[in-house]
């Protein structure tokens, strides 16, 4: 078995540490079920959707985690232009919205 070498960006470690901890302790990171390459003014990156409804953003080589967040239904649907194949994940993120997880992940630094 080849060891997995993934590192976290300084942004993930410093500015998103509370969010990442919240995800790890609330719903877990999960297994990758879909991926897509995205590009913006900073360049290309890979977005990974997990079976727990988390989006993990990595560098183009999938060696460095840049950030992550709990997806909302629209973000899950963006991975499936032909229609969502994994309805379980869609139901999960809708349940997370009912519980306010998407909002809570962003309030961790504020002490909430």
Could you tell me what each predicted segment is?
Residues 1-112:
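Ribonuclease/tRNase effector modules and their secretory precursors
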């Amino acid at each position: 078995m080849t060891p997995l070498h993934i590192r976290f960006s300084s942004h993930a470690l410093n500015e998103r540490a509370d969010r990442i901890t919240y995800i790890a302790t609330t719903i877990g990171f999960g297994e990758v079920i879909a991926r897509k390459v995205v590009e913006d003014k900073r360049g290309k990156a890979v977005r990974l959707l997990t079976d727990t409804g988390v989006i993990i953003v990595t560098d183009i080589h999938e060696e460095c985690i840049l950030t992550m967040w709990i997806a909302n239904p629209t973000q899950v649907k963006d991975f499936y232009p032909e229609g969502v194949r994994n309805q379980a994940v869609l139901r999960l993120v809708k349940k997370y919205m009912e519980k306010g997880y998407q909002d809570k992940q962003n309030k961790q630094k504020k002490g909430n």
